[in-house]
Swiss-Prot record:
Foamy viruses are distinct from other retroviruses in many respects. Their protease is active as an uncleaved Pro-Pol protein. Mature particles do not include the usual processed retroviral structural protein (MA, CA and NC), but instead contain two large Gag proteins. Their functional nucleic acid appears to be either RNA or dsDNA (up to 20% of extracellular particles), because they probably proceed either to an early (before integration) or late reverse transcription (after assembly). Foamy viruses have the ability to retrotranspose intracellularly with high efficiency. Residues 586-618 are annotated as: GR-box 3. It comes from Human spumaretrovirus. A motif (PTAP/PSAP motif) lies at residues 284-287. Changing residue 65 to A: 75% loss of particle export. Residues 535-556 are annotated as: GR-box 2. Changing residue 44 to A: 75% loss of particle export. Reduced virus titer. This is Gag polyprotein. Residues 230-249, 525-534, 624-642 have a biased composition (Low complexity). Specific enzymatic cleavages in vivo by viral protease yield mature proteins. The protease is not cleaved off from Pol. Since cleavage efficiency is not optimal for all sites, intermediary molecules are expressed. The keyword RNA-binding applies.
Amino acid sequence: MASGSNVEEYELDVEALVVILRDRNIPRNPLHGEVIGLRLTEGWWGQIERFQMVRLILQDDDNEPLQRPRYEVIQRAVNPHTMFMISGPLAELQLAFQDLDLPEGPLRFGPLANGHYVQGDPYSSSYRPVTMAETAQMTRDELEDVLNTQSEIEIQMINLLELYEVETRALRRQLAERSSTGQGGISPGAPRSRPPVSSFSGLPSLPSIPGIHPRAPSPPRATSTPGNIPWSLGDDSPPSSSFPGPSQPRVSFHPGNPFVEEEGHRPRSQSRERRREILPAPVPSAPPMIQYIPVPPPPPIGTVIPIQHIRSVTGEPPRNPREIPIWLGRNAPAIDGVFPVTTPDLRCRIINAILGGNIGLSLTPGDCLTWDSAVATLFIRTHGTFPMHQLGNVIKGIVDQEGVATAYTLGMMLSGQNYQLVSGIIRGYLPGQAVVTALQQRLDQEIDNQTRAETFIQHLNAVYEILGLNARGQSIRASVTPQPRPSRGRGRGQNTSRPSQGPANSGRGRQRPASGQSNRGSSTQNQNQDNLNQGGYNLRPRTYQPQRYGGGRGRRWNDNTNNQESRPSDQGSQTPRPNQAGSGVRGNQSQTPRPAAGRGGRGNHNRNQRSSGAGDSRAVNTVTQSATSSTDESSSAVTAASGGDQRD
């Protein structure tokens, strides 16, 4: 028999087991999960009793009969007084229990496996130590355990033998004392003669009773003296001495009696002789009984629920009972992750422990077959029974409170895993057509509805992540304040406008924009800010939106006027210069090297340029302004020199 693991399973022949039971007049069939003790009367080890314990396995986990029944070996001591036993040779029992063999270590001794020898017990009386054949099949550790158990049993047997020897010696001593009464000398139990009549002279006499006459006189009995054998030694009923006159009272004779003259002349009392003959022989004291205490099976270890660990993950339940079902449904996966729940009983204990015994919310194992049934039961108890056609209103309330994902989970729990119904209701509460389309495209790639129901939450979270939405289906841009960034380039992507150094009306076509144009620009800017505060998808903004769609000012308009009005302090620090002759001519503009930000050039100006007002863009424009002013001074000096040469 293999001994590598604690539980060993082998094939079982049920028909052969039924035949063995019938041969022993046991009119019943074996049961699934029944524990049987086997008493092996003989085997390859010899004609010595050995014991084994097995458990029958006739059904699977679904209570369906097995095609090939099995039995497993239980590593526990057999207790024949409390267990169902089957006795027989090893060869006969192996017909039903295939590969049956002896257990490991001292378990083969059965009720003596714990080392307690019980006096008078038939199983203890049949104890025999291990044989050489058994020793050859044992390992070193197993042999040490067996020898330790054998030594304990044999020490108890030696103690009992010594006790029997002491009792035997006591009985022999009593017999020797009894036999010594037939020899010379007064033994402690030998009879003694009555005292002479003179010893009763001073005692009061009893009154005579009419109708009762004294006993007939008889010759006095000789007293026994040392060295002489009394003539009435063999007489069991010796005659008593007669006394004249009325009957004398019976006197108790003992060493402290003052009426007894001498110890050697004590009279023999007939009543004492008769009482001594009635006394039974001394019964030897019973040896101390060593009561056999059967080894109880180890109690089943109850599952310890780490309730504090679970509460540290889920938190405390809400105080409002109507919020408990949603809270439990949301935390059910977390509870399974911390402590896997396998049985309804365990699930019921966990839920009742978490809820803390709220009135009316204690569940039974029948209500906790699954997490869905538990949540549905709590929801009905806290919200009342609702018809199935009102499930949409229930899910809508959950969507408003917890979001689409939680509403889908609880909807599946309340509807009994009806995916078609719940998905149809949830579809109407998805945040936007883009989410509906992307989610449906992902769900269509699944095999069946069961797979879709299991992966619905995963696909929903993936779509939310792609579209820039949080777990509640809301835009993540609503909580982020846009921060403008300075741009170093001078192309179309430049978002910050630099201050102009020249006068506002220098050059052709550089008139101040109309009031309607500025109002339209400000309204467009306010509209863009409103769009940032509203919910929506975090899509790429349209940077090059045309002006007719509200994208900004035309390419001919400059922001110099707005910059001068918004920052009068910057313009006041600079000294205005007079207009140069011919500064509005395009030819002179192309000949004079000037920066694009200082003069509103046609080629380098951003058509969608917005008015600056942020703090960080102001810092950048301060540096640019100094560089632009120095460049404009040099260019104006060159223009003046060229004009003087022409006049000369």
